[in-house]
């Protein structure tokens, strides 16, 4: 029986990953994914004791229903496991400048997360649903919030300050924050092991690619630049987010086309990206199927996605000085050999040479180098944000 079990809830914009993890060993006792929120085939899958399970959540369900299913179905069937849980850990995308490290959840912390919701409109509200559901279901357990933005507090000013009047930062904290920090912590640690280096001596570029996507330059184990900005909207092309664009487009939409600001916000966050370009889907699996079938919109969306990603990776060699490896992670990064190949081919100036067999083998949880011997290194590492969250949760409640 472990005294370090943590229930981790990781509420994404269109999915919810959950796990009961031994914070010391990283072993999953239960792990699962609820996905396709807002669609007709919303579902939940989980593993327990070697067995795989799946259930439908119902059409157009989302985070709240997924949390209720975990509590009322999965944990209710295994009360002995539920009794061993020492804390609930929550991944929080945006903590602004208020939260620079993980914290135990209090009413003040909940309010702080809510105050940052405008900076992560697809995520922080979902996190709050998870926190409130967990507080109701586990009133006696400490709850811990782990912030994606905390890892990026090591960025220098030249990386996080926008070219706006400085008083906007000084008075209103408008700056680059970055996300996916919890994933970056794990990836850097695991990449260092593969490379035979200490984390503090490791220089990598991490491409975390999912429905939300970002690139981070990590020098000597610390974040020095990242593609997401004040909010998760900046940077790469994503599932429904536009990423970088000329800010004057917003003025044009409002003044010339009659959009309201709320409509523009919805357009840029929920109707753009892969979905907007392809006019097909925000799901990269569907985009790849369309690409293989010759669908014009899907092909264009995939090409723009890969081109933008390759440009960011190339630019992030600037702050590193030395590049030990490019790491692909996240749902797309871990499973799309097509996107990895296209991106590395676009980086031909750096002499990356993809090993077709290794690249195709690195899918469905398989980790490994995907480039040829003698080539600069690119590898796939499945992320494990949940383990990092569990570790922080146990550290905090032990230190109380």
UniProtKB/Swiss-Prot annotation:
Catalytic activity: acetate + ATP = acetyl phosphate + ADP
Family, per entry: Belongs to the acetokinase family.
Record's subcellular location: Cytoplasm
Natural source organism: Shewanella frigidimarina (strain NCIMB 400)
Gene for this chain: ackA
GO BP terms in the entry: acetate metabolic process; acetyl-CoA biosynthetic process
One Gene Ontology molecular-function label: magnesium ion binding
One protein family per Pfam: Acetate_kinase
The protein's name in its UniProt record: Acetate kinase
Pathway(s) of this molecule: Metabolic intermediate biosynthesis; acetyl-CoA biosynthesis; acetyl-CoA from acetate: step 1/2
Binding site for substrate: 91
Binding-site residues for Mg(2+), renumbered to this chain: 10, 385
Source species taxonomy: Bacteria, Pseudomonadati, Pseudomonadota, Gammaproteobacteria, Alteromonadales
A cellular component annotation (GO) from this entry: cytosol
Cofactor note: Mg(2+). Can also accept Mn(2+).
Entry-linked CDD domains: ASKHA_NBD_AcK_PK
Site feature: Transition state stabilizer: 180, 241
Residues that, per the record, bind ATP: 17, 208-212, 283-285, 331-335
Location (main, coarse): cytoplasm
EC number(s) reported in the record: 2.7.2.1
SUPFAM superfamilies in alphabetical order: Actin-like ATPase domain (SSF53067)
Cofactor: Mg(2+); Mn(2+)
Biological function: Catalyzes the formation of acetyl phosphate from acetate and ATP. Can also catalyze the reverse reaction.
